[in-house]
């Protein structure tokens, strides 16, 4: 993933330094001593920003260097393709080194489309908590879908292979924050109902523009929402809600297949989750992924792991990241990789 630092590095670091980073990330060459120049990433996730960077301190996000992101869309509806220049630098370098695919993802709609004019929701906008967590105005779902499809087409026309676009990130998380205080990043939650509205609109826009790009669903903040009611009924049981046409429960009004998305042309049978928080112990690594894989298999759904880094505390062998040795960190990542690949049988794995 190019979040959070790649835009800053690509814009402001020296050519030699950022070229060196690109080589380490993307090169597949072997030097004269038989050593690999880089790790040869085959896929690169690109954050499509919502415009908090242009707002400056008014964005309410204190971290101005990493967590504010530019937006290609201007308020008047025109596009500025010179935005996110640092990220585009690394996209170009990835393509030059032979990176096969690019996945676009977004954390928020453009601020022009949000309820509070910010790139994250704030508390109190609605008496309905689930409406409060969602920051996209009802009248702008089609506009947001048009924006995402337009950005996708732009980069496809630039020669990038973009097999997937992910329009929603970690809907289970309550992104409501206090501007200028605890707002850490762009974010927006979507219930199953809101997800279906947005995904259906994006499916239609991708089709209108003649794009082969598909929609990547899920981006669950951990593995449990894939198969159970872990994070609230309006944000969980993703396999059943999106890929089981006969599924009904309290959270879809006992209406069979109310939020089914498996019949949309640009929705493949894929769900993705993040390996955060289920990485502390061998037992949690194994159990959550076994259950996710078992549920996915029932409906022919492939699983992807699309984000992981060390966010947790109370690991088996150490308290937290700062207390860990380099070997502790290496073994923790190896355990996550093992269980994601061998237990969850993921078809794709991405580091945050």
Positions of the model-derived regions?
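N-terminal catalytic cores of secreted or lumenal carbohydrate-active enzymes
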Residues: 1-163, 175, 182-192, 196, ...
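Short, well-ordered beta-to-alpha junction loops that form the rim of enzyme active sites
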Residues: 106-107, 167-170, 219-220
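Substrate-binding and catalytic surfaces of secreted/luminal carbohydrate-active proteins
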Residues: 146-159, 163, 174-352
């Amino acid at each position: 993933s190019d979040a959070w630092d790649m835009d800053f590095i690509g814009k402001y670091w020296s050519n030699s330094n950022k070229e060196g980073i690109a080589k380490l990330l993307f090169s597949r060459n072997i030097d004269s001593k038989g050593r690999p120049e880089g790790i040869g990433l085959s896929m690169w996730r690109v954050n499509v920003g919502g415009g908090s960077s242009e707002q400056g301190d008014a964005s309410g996000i204190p971290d101005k260097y990493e967590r504010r992101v530019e937006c290609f869309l201007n308020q008047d509806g025109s596009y500025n393709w010179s935005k996110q220049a640092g990220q585009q630098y690394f996209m170009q370098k990835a393509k030059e080194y032979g990176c096969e695919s690019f996945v676009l993802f977004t954390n928020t709609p453009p601020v022009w489309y949000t309820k509070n004019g910010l790139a994250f929701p704030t508390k109190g906008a609605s008496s309905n908590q689930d409406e409060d967590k969602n920051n996209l105005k009802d009248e702008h779902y089609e506009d947001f879908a048009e924006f995402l499809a337009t950005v996708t087409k732009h980069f496809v026309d630039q020669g990038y292979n973009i097999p997937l676009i992910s329009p929603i990130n970690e809907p289970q998380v309550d992104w409501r924050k206090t501007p200028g205080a605890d707002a850490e990043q762009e974010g927006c939650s979507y219930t199953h109902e809101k997800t279906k509205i947005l995904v259906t609109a994006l499916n239609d826009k991708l089709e209108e523009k003649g794009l082969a790009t598909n929609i990547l669903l899920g981006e669950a903040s951990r593995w449990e929402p894939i198969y159970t009611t872990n994070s609230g009924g309006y944000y969980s049981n993703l396999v059943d809600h999106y890929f089981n046409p006969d599924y009904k429960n309290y959270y879809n009004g006992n209406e069979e297949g109310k939020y089914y998305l498996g019949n949309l042309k640009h929705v493949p049978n894929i769900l993705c989750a993040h390996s955060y928080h289920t990485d502390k112990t061998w037992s949690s690594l194994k159990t959550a992924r076994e259950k996710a894989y078992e549920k996915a298999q029932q409906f022919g759904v492939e699983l992807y792991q699309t984000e992981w880094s060390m966010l947790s505390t109370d690991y088996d062998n150490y308290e937290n990241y700062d207390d860990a040795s380099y070997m502790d960190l290496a073994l923790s990542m190896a355990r996550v990789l093992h269980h994601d690949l061998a237990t969850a049988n993921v078809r794709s794995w991405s580091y945050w």
